[in-house]
Amino acid sequence: MSENPVRAFVGRSGDYRWDGVELLRYKDEGSVPFRDVTRQTLFRRPDMRGELRYFEVAPAGYSTLERHEHVHAVMILRGAGQVLVGEHVFPVTTLDLVTIPPLTWHQFRAGATSPLGFLCMVDAERDKSQLPSAHELEAMRANPTVARFFSPKGD
């Protein structure tokens, strides 16, 4: 075996990092709306279909509001926040498991004072995310709970 099979967790100083894993921007700036998110691909192999990634949303940050045909599972590893899944908003905290069904609008938001870190398991080959149209976003905002989620404390 030429490669070390262990990627040691090296985030002892408060940063959640793994040895030999590159810290990347969540997505290209300006490509889609999000705030203060990073990602790390922890596991990907050509002989397996799955991919395990770690995302971290900084305090008061959020992931992209999106949907896609593929299902994915998310386990919260750090912090607390909220997740929108469809028309429902749920509080999430460490070790909660969130299942995102196919073609379901979803977004993760960190709390105001601490980051929200989570593992995300998806197919390595997957469809591209879809963003809501202005009409779809307006329809979502008609739900008062969702509208509050999108605009916490007047954000």
Residue map of PLM features:
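Short, charged/polar surface micro-motifs in flexible loops or helix N-caps
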Residues: 47-50, 57-62, 80-82, 124
